[in-house]
Regions:
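A structural motif specific to WD40 beta-propellers
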Residues: 57-58, 101-102, 146, 201, ...
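Short loop/turn segments that connect beta-strands within beta-propeller blades
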Residues: 51-55, 95-99, 139-143, 194-198, ...
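Residue-level detector of Asp-centered blade-edge/turn motifs that repeat once per structural unit
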Residues: 29-31, 74-75, 118-119, 162-163, ...
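Beta-strand-rich domains and repeat architectures in extracellular enzymes and scaffolds
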Residues: 23-52, 56-58, 62-72, 333-345, ...
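A flexible loop/linker signature enriched in serine peptidases of the S9 family
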Residues: 39-47, 61-66, 82-92, 105-111, ...
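Hydrophobic beta-strand positions that form the internal "hydrophobic ladder"
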Residues: 35, 79, 123, 167, ...
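Bacterial N-terminal signal peptides
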Residues: 7-17
Length: 593
């Protein structure tokens, strides 16, 4: 199973140390819960229609929820696109003027990247409804569905051959899965398959990223973008546009300069268009001609090349406080900033103020609806991560320091306790290691937190009154994100002691260690429900749902939210999208509606 590439961004770096399953018995919860979480998904994206060079762009069906990955029908009269306007990602169709709007798929699973067949009768798309991202075909007249690829790994970006007999797609089924601390890199190759699922053929063998395929009009070549693994970090390296002969496998590199180049398409014969990214990015054409500048994502052109559609982010206000779609009605979701924590009365919320990849984080306090925001704590030299309210609501604990090893100064951080006005800050640790991610005991007398340092890894419990420290776990394994049960009897945490990261629980006296998850890939960010009956966590078990290079940079684009009972049973999926969802916490029971 795939695991995300954790590069230099917040949800990755907080997991790193400085250098050196239950049964699926389902029952309906007696209570209705609310989980707050952070996501690297765009706040909102809209689709735009423009001239073939990207000029004269105008919004198409602007909506407060995500619309993206649009493409034209073969006759150019309609547009199919993905939207989350009704919760989960589904595929819609509308005329060029936006009417009539028709929902083509309706499933709690992730449906995306839809393209209509050359005869206009079928829709190929990516769906997770079988448990991973596969290529599916929907017969538009009858609604009949079939899974074309049906493989345990991820298949993405379908493209119809001009005769409608074949589909080209990218897949990470042969990914190299190089280990990089918390996760692995996703690599993809280009494949062909007949529409009945037969004749599977691997086209590229680059052991890197080959994706976004598109057919030539004579069916002899496939166009795609290509990049080395080293180009997929937060500072993206160069990528190129390549054409491959399907008969001889001869590659022709169509570009050779620096910068990012993605999503190539043949338009109006042999002309090749693509998009570039960066401060001067926009629409490009092989040969040097430039189109409109600006952020252009997932472009598609009409058959004659006179029009194009694309999406871009249209809202950047941060942090958000808004409802999120949940696959389980008993567990409502609220998207917030990183590391949300509610006061015991539920009348105030603290979060970190920055998005991913920022070295300095302050703590914001606000009302639960996001209003009345103010900076509770900030420091010019140190970052404050993972604030958490005390059970009595009179104090807030947080990690404070330089968490990002190898970037700016030594990677040391401490555990701080402050009053709810951000004053009276008291440091509990000695500054000799990377301490972080505190969690209160139910009586408010102790804190459990992560210790990481040279030859020092584990979990530590501190007496808040005296500052006395007690080792809970220690060893070469990386134990992280402890969460103290409201019942007081167990502490949940993430550990790689048995290979990849899984969720464990342990008694506060260090006895009775139990492993709760046993899934290929990493499980992390565990948090107890207010009644101690459930644990929410992030897992990559659902795999990638798109090429990671085509999503806004985040190191784990396949992290979804899941819940399970306190003993690891009754595991349920809450989110199902192509973005990283993480750092969950719970709204107090008294604030549930």
């Amino acid at each position: 199973m795939r695991r995300g590439y954790y590069g230099v961004s917040l949800l990755f770096l907080i997991l790193l140390s400085p250098p050196a399953g239950g049964q699926n018995t389902r029952s309906t919860p007696d209570e209705r819960y609310t989980v707050a979480f952070a996501s690297v998904a765009p706040l909102n994206t809209d689709i735009f229609i423009a001239a073939g060079d990207g000029s004269d762009a105008r919004p198409f069906l602007a909506h407060p929820d995500l619309d993206y990955n649009a493409s034209f029908s073969p006759d150019g009269r309609s547009i199919v696109f993905t939207s989350m306007r009704n919760g989960s990602a589904d595929i819609y169709r509308a005329g060029i003027d936006g009417t009539p709007l028709q929902r083509l798929t309706s499933d709690p699973a992730f449906d995306d990247q839809g393209v209509v067949s050359p005869d206009g009768r079928s829709l190929a798309f990516v769906s997770s409804r079988s448990g991973q991202a596969d290529i599916w075909i929907l017969e538009l007249a009858t609604g009949a569905l079939r899974n074309v690829t049906n493989h345990p790994e991820g298949d993405f970006r379908p493209s119809w051959s001009p005769d409608g007999q074949w589909i080209a797609f990218s897949s990470d089924r042969d990914s190299r899965k190089l280990k990089f601390q918390f996760a692995t890199l996703q690599t993809t190759e280009i494949y062909l398959v007949r529409t009945d699922g037969s004749g599977l053929r691997r086209v590229t063998r680059r052991d890197a990223l080959a994706g976004g395929p598109a057919w030539s009009s004579d069916r002899k070549r496939v166009l795609y973008h290509e990049a080395e693994i080293s180009s997929l970090g937060p500072e993206r390296g160069p990528s190129q546009i390549v054409s491959i002969d399907l008969a001889t496998n001869e590659r022709q590199i169509l570009t050779d300069d620096g910068g990012e180049k993605w999503s190539p398409r043949w338009i109006a014969g042999d002309r090749v268009a693509y998009v570039s990214r960066g401060p001067n990015g926009g629409v490009e054409f092989v040969g040097g001609t430039k189109g409109a500048r600006g952020d252009v994502r997932s472009p598609a052109w009409s058959a004659d090349g006179s029009r194009m559609v694309f999406h871009r982010e249209v809202d950047s206000r941060w942090p958000p406080v808004r409802p999120g779609p949940s696959r389980e009605p008993s567990f409502r979701l609220v998207r917030t900033g990183i590391f949300p924590s509610y006061s015991p009365a539920g009348d105030r919320l603290v979060v970190n103020d920055q998005r991913l990849g920022r070295l300095r984080n302050s703590i914001l306090m606000m009302h639960p609806d996001g209003s009345q925001r103010s900076v509770l704590f900030g420091d010019a030299e140190r970052s404050a991560l993972a604030p958490v309210w005390s059970p009595r609501g009179d104090r807030i604990a947080s990690g404070v320091g330089r968490f990002f090893q190898g970037l700016q100064g030594p990677s040391t951080a401490d555990i701080a306790v402050m009053s709810v006005d951000g004053k009276d800050v008291r440091i509990l640790t000695d500054g000799s290691a990377n301490y972080g991610f505190p969690s209160w005991s139910p009586d408010g007398r102790q804190l459990v937190f992560r210790l990481a340092g040279k030859e020092r890894n584990g979990l530590v419990i501190a007496n808040v009154a005296t500052g006395a420290l007690k080792t809970l776990t220690a060893g070469v394994a990386h134990d992280n994100f402890p969460s103290w049960s409201p019942k007081g009897d167990r502490i949940a945490f993430t550990s790689d002691r048995d290979g990849d990261y899984e969720i464990y629980t342990i008694r506060p006296d260090g006895t009775d260690l139990r492993r709760l998850t046993n899934s290929p890939g990493n499980d992390a960010h565990s948090s107890w429900s207010p009644d101690g009956e459930w644990i929410v966590f992030t897992s990559v078990r659902g795999g990638f749902k798109d090429e990671m290079a085509l999503t806004p940079f985040n190191p784990q684009p396949n992290g979804d939210l899941w819940v399970m009972r306190a003993d690891g049973s009754d595991v349920r999926m809450l989110t199902d999208d192509q973005f990283e969802d993480g750092t969950p916490s719970w709204l107090p029971m008294s604030r549930r509606r």
